[in-house]
């Protein structure tokens, strides 16, 4: 299994995001909301939505890099065949300067592992 984050594994189209928001199931913890929906493919695709309220662009981009890296390095434990949208919650925004990558990784992976059809 390759550890790259290829173009086909990204959610890019507005209609894909809207479909997940409309028909997807959700899981959440104190840091993230994860929406997911079966995609009929043999791989999962990831989309990330970070609101401007989260902070300036550098903070938003840093979080998106972290989420992509977590997805990329842990494809083996994330169920295949789903479109996944990750949305950070207010608590993560408030604590972002104090939490490290490993804490964010643990919280996100706990949710991603729970995805099921």
From Swiss-Prot:
Disulfide bonds listed in the record: none
- EC number(s) on file: 3.1.26.5
Q: Keyword annotations for this protein?
A: Endonuclease, Hydrolase, Nuclease, RNA-binding, tRNA processing
Q: Which SUPFAM superfamilies does the UniProt entry name for this protein?
A: Ribosomal protein S5 domain 2-like
One of the entry's Gene Ontology molecular-function terms is: ribonuclease P activity
> What's a Pfam family this protein contains?
Ribonuclease_P
Domain of life where this protein originates: Bacteria
Q: Name one GO biological process term.
A: tRNA 5'-leader removal
- Catalytic activity, per the record? Endonucleolytic cleavage of RNA, removing 5'-extranucleotides from tRNA precursor
| GO cellular component labels | ribonuclease P complex
| Functional description taken from the UniProt entry | RNaseP catalyzes the removal of the 5'-leader sequence from pre-tRNA to produce the mature 5'-terminus. It can also cleave other RNA substrates such as 4.5S RNA. The protein component plays an auxiliary but essential role in vivo by binding to the 5'-leader sequence and broadening the substrate specificity of the ribozyme.
Subunit structure, per the record? Consists of a catalytic RNA component (M1 or rnpB) and a protein subunit.
Q: Which NCBIfam families match?
A: rnpA
Database matches in HAMAP family: RNase_P
The entry assigns this protein to a family as follows: Belongs to the RnpA family.
Q: What is this protein called?
A: Ribonuclease P protein component
Which species expresses this protein natively? Thermotoga maritima (strain ATCC 43589 / DSM 3109 / JCM 10099 / NBRC 100826 / MSB8)
């Amino acid at each position: 299994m390759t550890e790259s984050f290829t173009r086909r594994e990204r959610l890019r189209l507005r209609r894909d995001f809207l479909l997940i928001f409309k028909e997807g199931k959700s899981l959440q913890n104190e840091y993230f909301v994860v929406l997911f929906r079966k995609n009929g493919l043999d791989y999962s695709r990831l989309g990330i939505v970070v609101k401007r309220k989260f902070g300036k662009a550098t903070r938003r981009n840093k979080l998106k890099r972290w989420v992509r890296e977590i997805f990329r390095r842990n494809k083996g434990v994330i169920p295949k065949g789903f479109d996944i949208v990750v949305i950070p919650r207010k608590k993560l925004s408030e604590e972002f300067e104090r939490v490290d990558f490993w804490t964010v990784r643990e919280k996100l992976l706990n949710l991603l592992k729970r995805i099921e059809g």
